[in-house]
A protein has these predicted regions:
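Conserved nucleotide-sugar phosphate-binding/catalytic loop shared by glycosyltransferases and other
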Residues: 25-92, 284-286
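Glycosyltransferases and closely related glycan-assembly transferases
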Residues: 50, 102-113, 120-134, 327-328
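Conserved nucleotide-sugar donor-binding subdomain of glycosyltransferases
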Residues: 73-115, 119
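Active-site-proximal region of nucleotide-activated glycan assembly enzymes
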Residues: 128-198
Length: 348
């Protein structure tokens, strides 16, 4: 039986979402296989909740240091040389995490390695002559002038990605590539690049019984505001959204927070009064804003089909789903250069 190692970068949820979509397709290509998963933090916890613990492993790939809103650039750069907030210097982190992954490689004897965002396995697989696939939506992203100091890091990352046997772009082939401005592949590696399309499923995931939220929004026109990303990205996205609400006071909106926290679920009317979703439904409240911590698959499907437009930060996974599957117009309020590039491509 073939053994596959899947390594998932823990910065943001898109890497995990793509890999789970890939898992749904793998049986169409490989009949008998065993998969082991590796990540850390919140993604590790999701894997443990979803799969038997004996096939889920800790992989401490370094991640940026969170700031109040987005990664703290200064602290992340200083962390390359000194400990910051309990994180060892970046060089020590890299050495330790490669040592851990090396042990996993040697103990499991993988026949194939699939990585989404985690570049270390590319190096280990190449050194062991194990075929590897790197799933991505960026290689050498176009940086804006304010981010020139990231360029050496971008070149280093591109060099490690290039060590994969195959590079799978989770996007449509040119000229329909949303992440085009984040790729910029050199000629010498284009032979190993494959465009696989967006890892978004067109399967309808609707329950036969409507939830209270689905009943509450039935027949209304509204915009769907999606907060996505890790904690700091989610926070700054939410802050940017809130700055816009004063300009659209009478326009209905649903805000999904991508956090499994039911205390977030609140309905507001135009006077600012708040209600639970069930109370708002019972009292037939003329709502103006609905905040939801986490939408079920059925609720998300209903919201996307019913909304007039979506507001996003430029997350690649989300853009593929909204534009590719649902064909809804988007309004982009990006946080990072990567997201700005994708929003600009869509606008053009």
């Amino acid at each position: 039986m073939k053994k596959i190692g899947q390594f998932i970068y823990s910065w943001g949820n898109g890497h995990y979402t793509r890999m789970m979509s890939l898992n749904e397709e793998l049986p169409n290509f490989i009949k008998e296989y065993e998969t082991h998963y590796a990540s850390k933090d919140e993604i590790y916890q999701k894997l443990v909740a979803r799969f038997p613990k004996q096939i889920v492993h800790m992989a401490n790939a370094p991640t940026p240091i969170d700031g109040k809103y987005g990664p703290d650039v200064l602290l992340s750069m200083l962390n390359a040389f000194i400990p910051i907030r309990g994180q060892k210097p970046l060089i020590s982190q890299v050495v330790n995490y490669l040592r851990e992954e090396r042990r996993l490689f040697d103990s499991q004897k993988f026949d194939l390695v699939i990585n989404d965002g985690d570049m270390g396995p590319n190096i280990l697989a190449k050194n062991r002559n194990i075929p590897s696939i790197f799933v991505t939506n960026q290689f050498k992203p176009r940086l804006w002038k304010s981010r020139f100091y990231f360029y050496p890091g971008v070149l280093f990352i591109a060099k490690q990605i290039a060590k994969a046997t195959k590079i799978v772009v989770a996007d449509s082939p040119p000229p329909y590539t949303i992440c085009e401005y984040n790729l910029n592949f050199p000629e010498d590696i284009k032979h190993k690049v494959f465009y696989a399309g967006h890892f978004a499923s067109g399967k309808k995931k609707r329950n036969s019984i409507k939830s209270n939220l689905e009943k509450l929004i039935d027949g209304h026109r509204f915009g769907y505001w999606m907060r996505t990303g890790n904690k700091s990205t989610n926070d700054i996205t939410g802050k940017k959204y809130e700055e816009s609400f004063s300009q659209i006071k009478s326009e209905k909106r649903i805000i999904s927070h991508a956090r499994n926290d039911p205390t977030i679920d609140v309905v507001k009317d135009e006077k600012g009064n708040t209600y639970s979703i069930s109370d708002a439904l019972d009292k037939r409240i003329d709502w103006i804003q609905i905040d939801v911590g986490f939408l079920s698959e059925s609720e998300k499907e209903t919201v996307l089909e019913s909304c007039d437009y979506t507001v996003i930060n430029g997350s690649h996974t989300v853009m593929g789903e909204i534009i590719g599957i649902h064909g809804k117009p988007i309004i982009g309020i990006p946080v990072y250069d990567e997201q700005t590039n994708q929003i600009q491509w869509a606008e053009e």
